[in-house]
Design a protein with these regions (language model features):
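Cytoplasmic-entry segments and transmembrane alpha-helices of multi-pass inner-membrane transporters
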Residues: 2-14, 120-156, 235
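Alpha-helical transmembrane segments of integral membrane proteins
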Residues: 2-5, 96, 100-133, 172-316
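Hydrophobic alpha-helical transmembrane segments of membrane transport/permease proteins
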Residues: 18-71, 165-181
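Transmembrane helix irregularities
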Residues: 33, 144-147, 249
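Membrane-interfacial helix-loop-helix junctions in multi-pass membrane proteins
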Residues: 57-66, 82-92, 174, 272-278
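Individual transmembrane alpha-helix segments
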Residues: 66-109
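Membrane-water interface segments at transmembrane-helix boundaries in multipass membrane proteins
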Residues: 89, 138-200
Length: 316
């Protein structure tokens, strides 16, 4: 337990330089891009006096040197102040937090749907290796991996919302019903990828000596499958889930934009479009934290499931 605690502490400390490095790079890239946030704000208001533009730029601190701007933002971050949105004039932290429930709901539903679909089908395909079921599921996996998410989203919207009128076209991010189409869109793509990986992992395990030996001793295949093979395959499944959870918690920009799902992905797209620097930086910090924490939890689960896998802690 002591080593595990030390490892967790070490990884959390590593989060600090990671966040600093990523935020500095994103801050620099936004400035290098040359776009003017103030001009974006006044772009649809016709001719605006240069004095007004200069005053707004000074108010936002955009007339300061790059390092001064970054230092000011970093100082605010360390005191819990992520600034004010250039576009809405609202507190960035409060706005960002208000979008998290919609993203969390979509993440949970998508992961549940993916697990329910991909793991049983992947195992089934492996057990029925080189039979009709296997060929059919492999075709489904290939098709799901080939179709872009936006195409699947538009197809589902056309069928379920416009043609059959079963589900709302525009999601409001507050009900399960409005989450069905974006969840299906994400689950189809992830299930196609996961099913192929689960099939390959389970098939590899089924051909190992301990499984063949159990079969020779008369142990039922179903018993070996559920007690040994699936447990050995869990590391691969956990890796896939961890990667997907990280990206989903960051918001899926295209899907959220298509379905008008009011989550952090759509918020990030809108912020980038309007050059809302404080909001973009908040999103960058969120993504950095999420990926470090997801990787940390994954490493710990690896160690719990298979103690032979050593954590990155020096022997005492």
């Amino acid at each position: 337990m002591g080593k595990l605690t030390a490892y967790i502490g070490k990884r959390l400390l590593q989060l600090i330089p990671v966040v600093l490095g990523i935020t500095f790079l994103s801050f620099a890239m936004m400035r290098i891009a040359g776009s003017d946030a103030v001009m974006e704000l006044y772009g649809d208001k016709g001719a605006v006096a240069q004095e007004i533009i200069d005053a707004k730029r000074a108010e936002l601190g955009l007339d300061q040197p790059f390092l001064v701007q970054y230092g000011s933002w970093l100082k605010g971050l360390l005191t819990g102040d992520m600034g004010i949105s250039y576009v809405s004039g609202k507190n960035v932290f409060d706005t960002f937090v208000s979008k998290l429930p919609a993203t969390l709901l979509l993440t949970v539903l998508s992961i549940i749907a993916t697990v329910v679909i991909s793991i049983p089908l992947g195992i089934w395909a492996a057990v029925k290796h080189d039979r009709f079921v296997d060929y059919f599921l492999r075709f489904f996996s290939f098709l799901g991996n080939s179709l872009p998410n936006f195409f699947v989203a538009l197809l589902l919207m056309q069928l379920f919302s416009i043609k059959w009128k079963l589900l709302p076209v525009i999601s409001n991010g507050t009900t399960v019903q409005s989450a069905i189409l974006p969840t299906l869109t994400l689950a189809i793509a992830m299930s196609a990828k996961y099913m192929r990986q689960v099939r390959a992992t389970v098939l590899e395990e089924l051909n190992k000596d301990y499984v063949l030996g159990a079969k020779a001793r008369g142990v039922r295949e179903s018993v070996t499958l559920w007690k040994s093979v699936l447990k050995s395959s869990m590391l691969t499944i956990i890796t896939l889930l961890a990667l997907s959870i990280g990206s989903l918690l960051g918001g899926t920009a295209i899907i959220e934009s298509i379905f008008m799902w009011d989550g952090v992905g759509k918020l990030a797209v809108d912020a980038i479009t309007m050059r809302d620097y404080p909001m973009i930086q908040a999103y960058v910090v969120w993504m950095a934290i999420i990926y470090v924490l997801v990787n940390l939890i994954t490493d710990i689960l690896y160690h719990v499931l298979d103690p032979r896998i050593r954590l990155g802690v020096q022997e005492g």
